[in-house]
Amino acid sequence: MTMQPLIKLYDGRLMPQLGLGVWQASIQETELAVSKALEVGYRSIDTAAIYKNEEGVGKALKAAAVARDELFITTKLWNDDQHNPQQALETSLQKLQLDYVDLYLIHWPDPKQDHYVSAWRELVTLKEQGLIRSIGVCNFHIPHLQRLIDETGIAPTVNQIELHPLLQQRQLHAWNATHHIATESWSPLAQGGKGVFDQEIIRKLAQQYNKTPAQIVIRWHLDSGLIVIPKSVTPARIRENFEVFDFKLQKEELLAITKLDCGKRLGPDPEVFGSDR
C-alpha cells in the first residue's frame, strides 16, 4: 500500500493528510466510494450527519478487511443538534457501526443560535468517555475559535474550512497553526476545479509533472501543510486523487499557485450561516 503522510494533532493522535470526502453522495454511492477508497489505500473518511450517508460509510467499513485502528473516521455535529451532542453522536455511531469516531467536528458555529460553546463542552465530555478520539470544528473564524479557548481552555485539534486556490484563507490558516490547530481543506478542488483547473500555472505544472490538474491542486494542499479531503464517487477519480505521493511541488511553484487567491467563497459564509432562531 502507498505510504501516505500523517499529521500529528496536538492531542498526540495521527491523522492521514489525505482522505475521502463524501458530501452530496447517496448511501449507495457512499458505500461504493468508500469501498473503492479503502481498496486504493485511503484510510481517512470524512462524512457528516447532515450528509445523510453515514450508513453507507458504515456498510463499507463493515465489509472491508481493514483493522479499525488503521482507519480514521470523521463525522460532524449538525447545527440543530448542538443542544444535544450526545444523542447526535450516538445516532452517528449507530449508523457508522462504530464504537467511537476518530474525529468529531462541530459542523458550523451558527453564531445566531449561539450554542457552540456549550456544545464544545459536551464534546470534551464525550471524548473523556471514549466515544471520540479527537475533537474539532468546521468553518470557525478566529473570534469563534478564540471564544472556545477563552471559555473552555481547550482548543480544537482541527479546523476544517473551505480552502482552495481561489480562497486560501491564509490569515486563518496561520492563526490555526499558531494555536496548534491543524487546518483541513473542504472543497479543496473548488467544487470540481471550476476556475482553477484552467489556470495557466495549473495547466503548466500538470504538463510538467505528467499529472492531472486535480493532482496538482491536491499536491499544493499537501505541500502547504494542509489536510485535504477531495470528494469523489467515481472509482477512477478516487484512485487518481490518491496518486499524488510520487512528486512534490517546489517552493516557487507553490508561490505561483498562492497568487491565484481572490477570496472567492463557494460555500456559505460562517458568520451568517445557520439558524435564524
Curated annotation (Swiss-Prot):
UniProt cross-references to Pfam families, sorted A to Z: Aldo_ket_red
Gene3D superfamilies (UniProt xref): NADP-dependent oxidoreductase domain
Binding site residues for NADP(+): 187-241
Annotated substrate binding sites: H107
Cysteines paired by S-S bonds: none
Matches recorded under PANTHER family: 2,5-DIKETO-D-GLUCONIC ACID REDUCTASE, NADP-DEPENDENT OXIDOREDUCTASE DOMAIN-CONTAINING PROTEIN
Designated name of the protein: Methylglyoxal reductase DkgA
Organism the protein comes from: Yersinia pestis
